């Protein structure tokens, strides 16, 4: 029984792949083949998806010359009834209506051009569907005459034998035939191609539904087939499972990123293109329109930075591509980094190499299917062969070690299993996987989260020098990374995708100039309206009528400009502005507030982390801690907070000193069932609700976001709640461990202003070079058991890191060249 089900499953999978290929070509694949050339059709139309206009689906590739082949049918078609060509799908529908009556008849092969062969009868529903699809490719004239002949024979037989009247199914079929013929006459001018496409898509859906039923029978624990997962541009797709670098499409909470996303638009890129171009793109998530009638243009070889405030739809757009909701050319391979690698028994190296093996198996399966018609699929076969060659590198292990070490993995960590790593390190594993496989379109959603400065510097160098011939689409809250990496900026603003050449600084300059021009234009419109209003008050009735019409037209145009983002520069600044302010600490603490005296530390049974540290902190301190991963930056914060005690030496603190810590795990303290105001009142119950709402508003939480459960807030909004909590404790010294994760650029700038205006001390760890540049007055390097002040600015430190990376890269190239010479 189980073997039979697996056989059925394999048949279904093969049929799905075959059907997908047939629909992608937008023309039925011929089963009856002739050496005569078919009429060639130009590939000059856009392919639409989720569109009401079916004519936009048309992709008309050229038909190739093919050999002749024998096709089994259920009855030999009549040659006497040949007429003008009719729609092949009408014949197919008619054939289905009499299918039950023909089951007892034996199938006979029809000789086509004096050649014959036999085909086995279908054994299950999937085979039956396959035979139905084969019958569609018969010559349309023969299909029509065959079906008419069958109907006549059936009717004649029914009358002669005195058989019973037609059952309800036959009556319904007869009525449907009449309606179809009538509709065919009314739509003679309509393109037949569209009807065929729609019929094929309907068959694909039915087949996918049957496949889902089989999957449920075979494996009760298997995840149900989701239409979003199974279809790409309405087509069955086997590639989508490999589109996520994490190795999983389902989020940690069990949700599918594609759930709730709807997309419309037209694909412009031809099948063999390495670009992704879509016009009239609209994207919605859970009913909220995020992108409206925009163009998506991703040109091969360019590196795009996608920027927008949190909640605007950046991640939704990336998921829409990765989930197949936005169609892509068949030759374009893509991966998305959006979450950490799923923990398992694989080591770090094995986990990275695994993505290579999965991709290779997938490509080989695709190639096997395409080899059924190598002439027709020559372009796709060439693309797959090139991709397979790229995957078959002799130094794969060396590349994996290079990437992992660049992401600051130690040799000890590399040897660990992935289920022994924290979520932050598994995020680096997922990043290493996508960098190793290096798809044609690489999508990175906040890749610098969970990285330290050294890893960020290495990643910037890698993306800048190793992406030739590949396209990058990245969302990132680090302005420095956007400046170092990006050749173009895509600004998602007012539901539109606006494109700017250059990096982030260039975007800011061009955007500011454009805003000024828009402001001038808007002011001029207002002046013109004021003049018209004055004339309106001073003229006669006829002139007043004309002036009123002109004022009305200008008002309408001004309103349209405002809706499209063309507003005054004061309004633009107000929209972008966000203010965060920490409560004053009150002072009263003499310097030094904290003093380290010959402090050494090691965990029980572990190596020495610090040896004889001597330094002090006060309310004027603005210190950024930098250094390689594992050097002890977080441990130093714990020593300051007295969460761990020195092995030797002492840490002296003022008795009235108040400290506050922000770290990656503070979000666990939040009660997601409560609103921000409710949760803060549980911590500071003496403050009335009105005052609490005013305080929360300082941190960018206004209106509805103050009173809805925090489970409905974004990660960035929840971080603002934590900032509000820290500020209300009125600490003398703020300790921040990676505060910028999940914040957008505007919020990071607001945080920098808040720290600069804070009257207490600040000690922080961050991977954001720009935040350090904005806030830090001292840079301390934590390395080799010591803490030393860096003599220079953060730009100098970053330049030093990049020089080391460049030196290592040149050394590797030299070694490779020597190997090639040998």
From Swiss-Prot:
Location of the region described as Disordered in the Swiss-Prot/TrEMBL record: 1-230
Signal peptide: none
Compartment(s) of residence: Cytoplasm
Residues found modified as Phosphotyrosine: 57
Keyword Phosphoprotein part of the UniProt annotation: yes
Example of a GO cellular component annotation carried by this entry: cytosol
Entry's transmembrane regions: none
InterPro entries in UniProt: AAA+_ATPase (IPR003593), ABC_tran_Xtn (IPR032781), ABC_transporter-like_ATP-bd (IPR003439), ABC_transporter-like_CS (IPR017871), ABCF_EF3_subfamily (IPR050611), P-loop_NTPase (IPR027417)
UniProt keyword annotations, A-Z: ATP-binding, Cytoplasm, Nucleotide-binding, Phosphoprotein, Repeat
Gene Ontology MF terms: ATP binding; ATP hydrolysis activity
Disulfide bonds: none
Binding-site residues, ATP: 308-315, 627-634
Biased composition, class Acidic residues, residue ranges: 61-70, 92-106, 129-144, 163-172
Top-level taxon of the source organism: Eukaryota
Compositionally biased spans, kind Basic residues: 34-44, 73-85, 111-121
Biological process annotations from GO: cytoplasmic translational initiation
Residues of the ABC transporter domain: 276-519, 594-809
Residues recorded with modification Phosphoserine: 27, 47, 51, 55, 97, 137, 163
UniProt keyword annotation of Phosphoprotein present: yes
UniProt family annotation: Belongs to the ABC transporter superfamily.
The name this protein goes by in its record: Uncharacterized ABC transporter ATP-binding protein C825.01
UniProt source species: Schizosaccharomyces pombe (strain 972 / ATCC 24843) (Fission yeast)
